[in-house]
Design a protein with these regions (language model features):
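Active-site and donor-binding regions of nucleotide-sugar-utilizing enzymes
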Residues: 18-163, 189, 288
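Nucleotide-activated donor-binding/catalytic signature segment of Leloir-type glycosyltransferases, i.e.
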Residues: 250-266
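C-terminal amphipathic helix plus adjacent low-complexity
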Residues: 329-385
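A donor-sugar binding/catalytic signature common to diverse glycosyltransferases
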Residues: 139, 143, 266-312
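Single conserved hydrophobic/aromatic residue that forms the stacking wall/gate
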Residues: 1-12, 385-386
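Alpha-helix C-terminal capping/helix-to-coil transition sites in glycosyltransferase folds
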Residues: 7, 64, 123, 275-276
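Conserved catalytic-core segment of nucleotide-activated headgroup transferases in glycan assembly
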Residues: 158-252
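Nucleotide-sugar donor-binding patch of glycosyltransferase catalytic domains
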Residues: 148, 293-342
Length: 387
């Protein structure tokens, strides 16, 4: 039986490409999988997909790949270490960006560009960026290398042009909420981080604005409570941020027991939750851009603080400062089919989409695959790390 008589040489046969992701579903997989599938089809090669935290050192030694793909080389130390080790072992290395909506922190873009990579050195042979705006940011860094940094567009957003998502009836029936014909999604924020003294995100990103953001949590809790009470005919899908752990810092804690509320965290894909709603409301959420790609209206509810270190994506949604005006916007949508304040920002949204994700044509994965194919087939390894 050939399946039981294989030697070690067969078991550890060198693979063409080894891909590492942070999880088996969600953002990282959405980023790399369309590209991997195209590479498999175009090049007729073997690609092995592995969980980053399984044992990336063992996997690189075991499979001896010609090329390693890392969905993100800066977001956590393991991603960076996998990139460095693969390069050290002579593998060609390609990295994507998990969060490419860069912003300045303390007057610098360095933290967003390099994360844990304090040496600000690109260990990869090819780094694919979301937008030309990001590449211009990179040009201000000592780590910029025109031969390595290329523009593909944000591949993780291609799905909004290529795929179909769960319909409203299917999702609502699943949770026995199918009697509702009006659906509003409330997108959660990481208030957890703002109150956690051991987490650096709050102080680093917001500085003196932090207290206003903390106060916003309690205003949102009260505002959402009033909104839910006043609209029993609307289903509010409260989508907690996936990293929220402490219920005390959850903006939805006061509405959990209402019959017109569905609390979700990681049970459903965020794009399905967006797809079934009419309006998406958030304190601050880059998910708003994804809602635009699905032709949804978005509103930002900021009752305490409106100006802080926030994504440029916020400029594409009306900022509502009190519950009365939030209610008026919702009423306007359900009576007219639109919200004028939202419609007035159409040109802003088109510019934001270009600035943030590069392209919204569903072809970012094709551009990325073309760069990787060129590296795989033609180019010598660019990054050499001596042991």
């Amino acid at each position: 039986d050939s399946s039981t008589s294989r030697g070690l040489g067969d078991v550890y046969k060198r693979q063409d490409i080894l891909s590492f992701t942070y999880s088996s579903r969600g953002r990282d997989v959405d980023i790399v999988e369309p590209v991997l599938s195209k590479l498999e089809k175009d090049l007729d090669i073997t690609i092995t997909r592995k969980w980053l935290y399984d044992n990336f050192v063992f996997d690189i030694l075991k499979y001896r790949p010609k090329l390693v793909i890392d969905a993100n080389a800066i977001g956590c130390r393991n991603h960076l270490w996998a990139c460095r080790f693969a390069s050290m072992m002579g593998c060609k290395v390609v990295t994507f960006v998990s969060e490419g909506d860069y912003r300045y922190i303390d007057g610098s873009i360095t933290t967003m560009l390099f994360g844990w990579n304090t040496k600000e050195r690109l260990y990869e042979d090819l780094h694919l960026e979301w937008s030309q705006r990001n590449i211009e940011y990179f040009k201000t860094s000592k780590g910029y290398d025109n031969n390595k940094i290329k523009l593909s567009g944000a591949t993780g957003f291609d799905k909004y042009s290529l795929l179909s998502f769960m319909d409203r009836q299917s999702l609502l029936s699943k949770y026995k909420k199918d009697k509702f014909t009006k659906v509003v999604t409330l997108a959660g924020y990481t208030f957890d981080f703002m109150f956690n003294e051991n987490h650096s995100t709050g102080p680093i990103y917001f500085g003196k604005e932090l207290e206003g953001i903390k106060a916003s949590l309690f205003a949102l809790q009260d505002g959402y409570l009033e909104l839910v009470k006043n609209n029993p005919d609307i289903l509010f899908i409260a989508k907690k941020h996936p990293l929220t752990e402490n219920k005390n810092y959850d903006e939805f804690s006061k509405i959990e027991k209402f019959k017109n509320v569905l609390i979700l965290q990681t049970e459903e894909n965020v794009f399905d939750v967006i797809n079934v709603c009419d309006i998406l409301i958030a304190f601050e959420s880059t998910t708003a851009l994804e809602a635009w790609l699905l032709k949804k209206h978005t509103l930002l509810y900021n009752p305490i603080i409106q100006k802080f270190n926030r994504s440029s994506i916020s400029e594409g949604s009306p900022i509502i400062e009190n519950i009365e005006n939030l209610q008026k916007a919702i009423d306007e949508y359900y009576s007219t089919g639109g919200i004028k304040l939202f419609a007035d920002k159409e040109n802003d949204r088109l510019k934001i989409i270009k600035d943030v994700i590069g392209f919204a044509d569903g072809k970012n994965y094709q551009r990325a695959a073309a760069y990787i194919e060129d590296l795989y087939l033609n180019k010598q390894k660019l990054s050499l790390i001596h042991i």
